[in-house]
Amino acid sequence: MTDVQQVLARADQNLSTSLERLFELLRIQSISTDPAYKAECRKAAEWLVGYLGTLGFTASVRDTPGHPMVVAHHAGASADAPHVLFYGHYDVQPVDPIELWENDPFEPSIKDVGEGRKILTGRGTSDDKGQLMTFVEACRAYKEINGALPCRVTILFEGEEESGSPSLKPFLEANAAELKADYALVCDTGMWDRDTPAIAAALRGLVGEEVIVTAADRDLHSGLFGGAAANPIHILVEALAGLHDETGRITLDGFYDGVEETPDNIKASWETLGKTAESFLGEVGLSIPSGEKGRSVLELTWARPTAEINGIWGGYTGEGFKTVIAAKASAKVSFRLVGTQDPAAIREAFRSYISAKIPADCSVEFHPHGGSPAIHLSYDSPVLTKAKNALSDEWPKPAIVIGMGGSIPIVGDFQKMLGMESLLVGFGLSDDRIHSPNEKYELVSYHKGIRSWVRILQALAA
């Protein structure tokens, strides 16, 4: 067997013990958005440092004002080998609503779901602990067979991706010389379908905002004050309802500055993928497309901007009933950006729009929650071509190059601050329920994900 075949065989042999290691990491409740889990986030970072040390990496926990980073270096490859920076995140989303989980979210398991499929269940299986471990386990297989890796490898794992990555930019600035590589590898994306791997070449940007409207200085009796006193819930929902017009377009002033129409040849290539609104929405129990009228579901999710209300609350929400007019109402709103839309300009447009809707005797405050521009990568870069061929050798169907509706701010940071383009490869599926109860990761995604990184590292080094 060739070296790569021997490494692939070792990855297969290691699968059972690899799952045991993954489950150890999954049991750590590294929820970055909740301060109550600060110690768990550090525990996850320390676990990763300990494990990477067994693979020959020089690894360390790096403190930040928030949750720590993990940085590791493996210099076993030759000096002229390509240098790659692999990025992932060990933090996870909260598990609410806990009552909707079929199992303990932090007690992972393997489930047989029929038709030859098995899934890994638990928070972080797909986003992103399972994904990052595919790369780490590929490194393990190489070390056990060759004693070295085919590329020089630096690893960066962060613990605040799910909470807006507030410490990431300062950390990159302070450690740019140490972290700079030939290119970055990012494993926080997904497959096109169960048999078709994908490389994402475009990502939407993101702006997050929390808005709080305050009316009276306390909750009011709705019988005594109803009809006379301002109701902040009414004010807020009316303002938010006006974010879209009847055609689905967003009404903020200047919102579409920097948004270009998708070229016809690109739209034609997307049409060949066979993804209809019905098939796309049917996976989540819906059937009628929303958003801008007259556009395909792939254009809407890959190439058009959005405004979404992610949460809204105010007044009494407990058991039973309480007739009050709330003193405050709050919402969290996110915008996905495309083209050259400016996150700062979008944030200002939203704040101006909401502020203009607030009565004179009420007040409004805003809290930012991250902001990053859209990213476009070259469709014909040599790195992308090598990875595409390597993935095609592993999976039943050839790899494809796609857009991506989500945001990975680190990709823009790598490009802007370290001068590196990123290869975006992941093995999640659209039904993995990331950020939702009953998150899962296909066993074949994990297994073939490891094998895929074995092939990609070999291809990059060739």
Model-assigned labels for residue ranges:
Residues 2-98, 328, 345:
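N-terminal helical capping/dimerization or prosegment-like subdomains
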Residues 79, 193, 251-328, 340-349, ...:
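An extended, acidic, His-containing surface patch that forms the Zn2+-binding/catalytic region
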Residues 81-157, 448:
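Active-site metal-coordination/substrate-binding segment of hydrolases
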Residues 90-91, 243-247, 351-361:
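A common structural junction motif
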Residues 117-121, 217-223, 318-319, 434-436:
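Short small-residue beta-strand/loop micro-motif enriched in glycine and branched aliphatics
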Residues 124-289, 298-305, 414, 438-444:
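Fold-level recognition of mixed alpha/beta catalytic cores in primary-metabolism enzymes, strongest
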Residues 126, 217, 336-342, 372:
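A generic structural motif
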Residues 209-212, 327-335:
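Oligomerization/assembly interface segments of phage tail-like spikes and tubes
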